[in-house]
């Protein structure tokens, strides 16, 4: 078996336009395609993260809220590798996105921090 890369990650959002604005205009991902699927009554937005990875956004009517405390099984957070955590945090803050203080990962010794998407999904920056 050769699982060589992560092709895509799919998340469900409560507000399509807010999620699209966040991931495209604030994080800079490019739109591959977007479709309204009337049979499912939802939007599907495919975004290019980099040459190897895509992010799928599904916007459904009234999805249940994300469980943060206590944490539930499933995706805990989504982490993005960056060259400079400080520079990326600066750019995010200039876009109105709050970030936690930068800290050093106890295991890797690398700088990292967290912020959240509009639905509260924790997103990590890691050098």
Q: What are these language model-derived features?
A:
Residues 71-86:
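Mid-chain, well-packed structural core segment of small domains
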Residues 22, 86-91:
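Short amphipathic alpha-helices within nucleic acid-binding modules
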Residues 32-34, 41-43, 62-68, 101:
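A short, acidic/glycine-rich surface segment
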Residues 50-54, 62-63, 85-86:
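Short, charged/polar surface micro-motifs in flexible loops or helix N-caps
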Residues 1-2, 35, 46-48, 89-127:
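Vicinal oxygen chelate
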Residues 1-18, 75-78:
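N-terminal beta-strand motif that seeds the catalytic metal site of vicinal oxygen chelate
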Residues 41, 74, 109:
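Exposed loop/turn and edge beta-strand positions of beta-sandwich/beta-sheet ligand-binding modules
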Residues 12-54:
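Core segments of cupin and vicinal oxygen chelate
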């Amino acid at each position: 078996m050769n699982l060589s890369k992560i092709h895509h990650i799919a998340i469900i959002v409560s507000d399509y336009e807010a999620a699209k604005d966040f991931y495209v205009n604030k994080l800079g991902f490019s739109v591959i395609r977007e479709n309204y699927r009337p049979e499912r009554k939802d939007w599907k937005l495919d975004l290019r993260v980099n040459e190897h990875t895509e992010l799928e956004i599904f916007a459904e009517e009234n999805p249940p809220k994300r469980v943060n405390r206590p944490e539930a099984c499933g995706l805990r957070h989504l982490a993005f590798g960056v060259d400079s955590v400080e520079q990326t945090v600066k750019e995010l803050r200039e876009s109105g996105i709050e970030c936690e203080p930068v800290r050093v990962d106890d295991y890797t010794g690398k700088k990292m921090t967290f912020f959240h998407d509009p639905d509260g999904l924790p997103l990590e920056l890691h050098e």
